[in-house]
Amino acid sequence: MWSAGRGGAAWPVLLGLLLALLVPGGGAAKTGAELVTCGSVLKLLNTHHRVRLHSHDIKYGSGSGQQSVTGVEASDDANSYWRIRGGSEGGCPRGSPVRCGQAVRLTHVLTGKNLHTHHFPSPLSNNQEVSAFGEDGEGDDLDLWTVRCSGQHWEREAAVRFQHVGTSVFLSVTGEQYGSPIRGQHEVHGMPSANTHNTWKAMEGIFIKPSVEPSAGHDEL
């Protein structure tokens, strides 16, 4: 059985955050390689299964019982926005380009929980469960994901992978779909190896203007 948490006025919260980002020095990054930057709010598309990373105030009925994370086909769902943040020690100033190999937190905008994984089996595929955890953006060390990409910085047009710092799995989708109450949504889980099921691309969102110019780099993907 699934359990739903408290409701809320989702759109005012999202609108307030997006307006807060649109201050001098913010806005869409249209220069250079079009980089993803710290503080940006975006949707992430799994490039193989064509679903966006999603969460909502519905908890898993098995495993950890934490807030569920899924993939949805809709492009206009407000529950698919995530904010790029640094670890608890910082290291991701607002507007700085995200480096390939950098560890980040992905915070779900409407619930304030961080993308998280741990050693629980996922409900459908029996891979590693991925959940949303924490309160107001504060969780634990299992919220950290390393951005694996080609070059020096995460480019908006490029495919990337997210490898979990604590358990080394890759954020993945393999096509399994849930029934009620989230019928049609896809299971998101962790897999131990890099493959076509775990490549993601930045899509819709608010991208903070880079505070430094990009430079040539290396290949991490």
From Swiss-Prot:
InterPro entries in UniProt: MIR_dom_sf, MIR_motif
Record-linked SMART domains: MIR
One Gene Ontology molecular-function label: misfolded protein binding
Domain of life where this protein originates: Eukaryota
Annotated signal peptide: 1-28
Span(s) of short sequence motif Prevents secretion from ER: 218-221
Family matches, as Pfam families: MIR
Tissue spec. comment: Ubiquitously expressed with high expression in testis, moderate expression in the pancreas, spleen, prostate, small intestine and colon. Very low expression is seen in brain and skeletal muscle.
Occurrences of domain MIR (ranges): 33-87, 95-150, 151-205
Phosphoserine: modified positions: S215
GO cellular component: endoplasmic reticulum; endoplasmic reticulum chaperone complex; endoplasmic reticulum lumen; membrane; protein folding chaperone complex
Name assigned to this protein: Stromal cell-derived factor 2-like protein 1
